[in-house]
Amino acid sequence: MELLIKNARIIDAIQDFKGDIYIKDGVINEIAKEINKDNVEVLNCEEKILMPAFIDTHAHFRDPGLTWKEDLESGSKAALKGGYTGVCLMANTKPICSSKEVVQYVRDKSKELDLIDIHQCISVTQNFDGKTLDHLNEFKDDNKVKAISDDGVGVSNSNIMLEAMKIAKENNWVLMSHAESPEFSKSDMRIAENMMTIRDVELAKLSGAHVHMCHVSTKEALKCIIAAKNEGANITLEVTPHHIGLTKEINDYRVNPPIREKEDVEEIIKAIKMGNIDTIGTDHAPHTLEEKSKGSPGMVGLETAFPICYTKLVRENGVSLNELSKLMSLNPAKLLGMNKGKISIGVDADLVLIDIDKKIKVDSNEFISKGRNTPFEGMEYYGEVLATIKSGKIKYKK
């Protein structure tokens, strides 16, 4: 399989130049100002932006068990439309991803679909019971496991969480933390996030584990995590497009953690500009409109993530496309141990072609995802994905 990409403006975390890319057997084989090959498929980019495809550190595909909301196929196709070729899926499926059988189902289905790379998280505690860690022993020799997560139901017992972090460190896993204190989750969601953030940061320092703080949304939580990172703690920090693109004043849409105040958004953007944020994760969480009307928290995000982040960060706040590529591609690839996220010879040929000058209007009826739950309906942003390439194959084309 060969593909020649011509006339691209090539951008990744450290590069920005015009050139061509030759792909062979799924990897980048040659990069130059001009490349000519006979009898190969050619994609003419017409000087549009070509970046490493995005990798989502945080998504929910609802499969198995909740597939009226989303499934592995619809979620993967939505990812491709959004420019993503890799996702890390949370464990709150039905049954919960606490057993080899459930994890193998996801892997087998993903391989059968052959659309994107899917990393399935294991639940921190067995079936989210908050206390049992024995199931983690099943995965100690499974080198495909990259992360364990409590997203959906946090681990309230600090001793259990510390032990889980120690197990994660022993196995070179990332522990993904959904910081929400159950004592405050019904009364004050700001305190709920801040209190659990403080705890998990302290446990991360104590255990030495790599702890990934998911969907950080308050200025206080940011300050706590950044201080620990500066002290050398092995912590990575994730924010979402909706916590960048919305404030409570614009749309107090129900997500968890909630849409925050203007000053929180300003602090997130400031932290991005200072290089203190590691990844942007969508927290793609599809629900039916009926479920949303009854208060289910969450929103779809894969198909809108890039235009929101590009518009809010690059066009409005002066963040470079290089930095955005770092947040959406390079750092997520490093986090998940993937040979992707940059444009260099020998790297997997996962790429996205984008028209950054094209204005789009969010229309949920055009989503490939089964979910239509978005607070961005009717809003306009810049940046349209024209094509997504996975292992040298064009998997999505506008």
Curated annotation (Swiss-Prot):
Q: GO BP, one example?
A: 'de novo' UMP biosynthetic process
Free-text remark on how the cofactor is bound: Binds 2 Zn(2+) ions per subunit.
Looking up InterPro entries in the UniProt record yields: Amidohydro-rel (IPR006680), DHOase (IPR004722), DHOase/Allantoinase_Hydrolase (IPR050138), Dihydroorotase_CS (IPR002195), Metal-dep_hydrolase_composite (IPR011059), Metal_Hydrolase (IPR032466)
Q: In which pathway does it act?
A: Pyrimidine metabolism; UMP biosynthesis via de novo pathway; (S)-dihydroorotate from bicarbonate: step 3/3
Q: Which chemical reaction does it catalyze?
A: (S)-dihydroorotate + H2O = N-carbamoyl-L-aspartate + H(+)
Q: Where does Zn(2+) 2 bind?
A: 151, 178, 215
Q: Which cofactor does it need?
A: Zn(2+)
Q: Where is the active site?
A: 283
One GO MF annotation is: dihydroorotase activity
Q: Which GO terms describe its cellular component?
A: cytoplasm
Task: Provide the top EC class.
Answer: hydrolase
Keyword set, alphabetical order = Hydrolase, Metal-binding, Pyrimidine biosynthesis, Zinc
Q: Does the keyword Protein transport apply?
A: no
Q: What is its EC number?
A: 3.5.2.3
Q: Where does substrate bind?
A: 60-62, 92, 256, 287, 297-298
Signal peptide region: none
Q: Which Gene3D superfamilies match?
A: Metal-dependent hydrolases (3.20.20.140)
Tell me the residue numbers annotated for binding Zn(2+) 1.
Answer: 58, 60, 151, 283
Q: Per its UniProt record, what NCBIfam families does this chain match?
A: pyrC_multi
Cross-referenced PANTHER family: ALLANTOINASE (PTHR43668:SF2)
| Family, per entry | Belongs to the metallo-dependent hydrolases superfamily. DHOase family. Class I DHOase subfamily.
Q: What does this protein do?
A: Catalyzes the reversible cyclization of carbamoyl aspartate to dihydroorotate.
Protein name listed in UniProt = Dihydroorotase
